[in-house]
Structure formats: C-alpha cells, structure tokens
Amino acid sequence: MKGNGSTLLNASQQAPGVGEGGGPRPSWLASTLAFILIFTIVVDILGNLLVILSVYRNKKLRNAGNIFVVSLAIADLVVAIYPYPLVLTSIFNNGWNLGYLHCQISAFLMGLSVIGSIFNITGIAINRYCYICHSLKYDRLYSNKNSLCYVFLIWVLTLVAIMPNLQTGTLQYDPRIYSCTFTQSVSSAYTIAVVVFHFIVPMIIVIFCYLRIWILVLQVRRRVKPDSKPRLKPQDFRNFVTMFVVFVLFAICWAPLNFIGLIVASDPATMAPRIPEWLFVASYYMAYFNSCLNAIIYGLLNQNFRQEYKRILVSLFTAKMCFVDSSNDPADKIKCKPAPLIANNNLIKVDSV
C-alpha cells in the first residue's frame, strides 16, 4: 500500500508543465482538455438523466429492452459524478493533490463505468438479436422480471471483472492525462487479458448479433413484393439503427486506447516510450467523451425519446412535475404494435429502443 502511495506522489510531481521527452507541454493543452471534460460532464449528466426520466415517465418507453438502456445510462453517469470532476481538479492544479484513496476510488469507478458500458452494450445487442431473430421466444426470455435479472447479472460480472485491479497495482495516476486510471505497462499478461475479455470478446459478440440482424432485415426486405404492403416500418428500422449507432460510436471511441494497450503490453519497456504522447492523450479523452454521446444519439434518432426530452424540458421551464407519467398525452393514445415480419422463426419484429 505504501509503495503504491509513493508511486502516486512521484507521478504527481512529474505533472506540472512537462510534456513528451521532458519538454514543456503546450500552454493550450490543459485548457483544451478542461473544456472537453467540462462539456462531457454537463452533457453526460443532463443527457443521461433525461434518458432515465424519459423511460420512467413514458409507458411506450417502459419495456424490457429499455431496462438495458437505463442501465447503460447509469454506467455513463458514474464517471460524470465522481471521476471526471476529480480529473478536472487535477487539470486545474496541474497535478494530483487529492491523495491515494481518492485516486484509487476514482480509477475503480472509471473502470466500473467502462466495463459496465461494454457489458450493457453487449446485453442490448443480445436483446435486439433475440427480439428480431427469435421473436417467438422473446416475450418468454425477456419479461420485465427476467430483464432485471439480466441487468443485475451484468453488474455482478462487471464487479467481478474490475476487482482484480485493486490487487494488481494497476490503478495509478498518469500525469499525461491528469487521471488516476488503469496503467497498461504494469503487467503485460493482465493488460492483454483486460483488453481481450473486457473489449475484444464483447465486441465480437455484439458484431455477431448485429450482423445477423442486418442479414435478416435485408432478407426480409428482398422477400417483400413491390405491390405488397411493406412490413418493416421505417420507425422500427430507425429504432434498431439507434442502438447500432451507439455500438459503433463506442467502438470508435474506445478502440484506439485498447489497441495502444495491446501494443504496450507486447513489450512495455520498449513500446511504452514509443507511443506518442499526443496519441495517448487523444485516445483517452476520446474514450472519456463517449460517455455523453448516447443520450444525444437517442434524441437524434429515436422519435419517442426526442418527444419525451421535449416534454421534460418544457415541464422544467413551466414548473411542472418531471416525474408525472406523460403517457396520457393525446398524441400517445394511438397504440403502436410491432408488425410481424416473415423471417427466421416465421416472425420478425423490430421495435423499441
């Protein structure tokens, strides 16, 4: 424990104004990183609270699939409430002065958030796969009770996955990014295991699920005759695309950092110094930025979320209660039932985020 504490103190002493190769860091760098982080924190908190409130208020959004969406929003909120503000403090102070305990808690919660996000995105992909490709079994597999159990299992697995970080000494302060985080160069074997099991394997599962969905949707569209009534509603397709975009942006934002981890783990002593500091910093803050994107995606691509966002914001400005069920709105009285699509299992339905 003392050894880790001294490592933290030594690292924090290296932070002020020192850049790659021991030279001075650009004066604008800290300001730019602070701006990115402030924007991320504000949009993360406001956006994900809107997501949670929207699902709570609107019966059309209160379904088994959106239980995973709320869980993902909670994972994104975790970093905005505690770790990111501490990183911001470190930027303003040009080093970490909050002590060893806060460093460990911050790094732990950051890892909890990212692994929780990956596992929830995987859960969402499996949910969409079952909904579309195995629609006859979906209601039995994804009752509200079962979905809550799946989300609980996701967070249990997340805790199990993150706990070894507390024992391996990999949670340390890195002055390059002003953050207490997972240190890739401490253990090659452990870093490779983290990247493989916490990123690559979940991504393979997600890619498989969405690839199967795309294939099935294309097959269904080709089977529909020109003179027949289309069975795949545009809104249904947009709802699926919404969650696909969430996955793609997550992969884009987190892939560079994970690939850097694999490169460093191959030979820490040789490869770590060869990673350009600008690339390392950019990959980290691109990953940080991802936590504020999901709520924006829902608002842009999903009509139900977009309408509920507007209602919540209007209710705030008109001093109405945000927690009132909005499903009694006249515009929502038209019930939308998912259209069955002839495909695998003879039925295919695409509905909800």
Curated annotation (Swiss-Prot):
Cytoplasmic topology ranges: 54-66, 127-147, 212-243, 299-353
The protein's name: Melatonin receptor type 1A
Principal localisation: membrane
Membrane topology, from the record: Multi-pass membrane protein
Distribution of this protein across tissues and organs: At least in the brain, more precisely in the pars tuberalis and the suprachiasmatic nucleus.
Places the protein is found: Cell membrane
Keyword Metal-binding: no
GO cellular component, one term: plasma membrane
Family: Belongs to the G-protein coupled receptor 1 family.
Molecular functions (GO terms): melatonin receptor activity
Ranges per topology, Extracellular: 1-32, 88-105, 169-190, 265-277
Chain positions covered by the region annotation Disordered: 1-23
Comp. bias (Polar residues): 1-15
Annotated glycosylation sites: N4, N10
Keywords: Cell membrane, Disulfide bond, G-protein coupled receptor, Glycoprotein, Membrane, Receptor, Transducer, Transmembrane, Transmembrane helix
Positions of disulphide bridges: C103-C180
Species annotation: Phodopus sungorus (Striped hairy-footed hamster)
InterPro entries assigned to the protein according to its UniProt record, in alphabetical order: GPCR_Rhodpsn, GPCR_Rhodpsn_7TM, Mel_1A/1B_rcpt, Melatonin_rcpt
Source species, domain of life: Eukaryota
Record-linked Gene3D superfamilies: Rhodopsin 7-helix transmembrane proteins
GN (gene name): MTNR1A
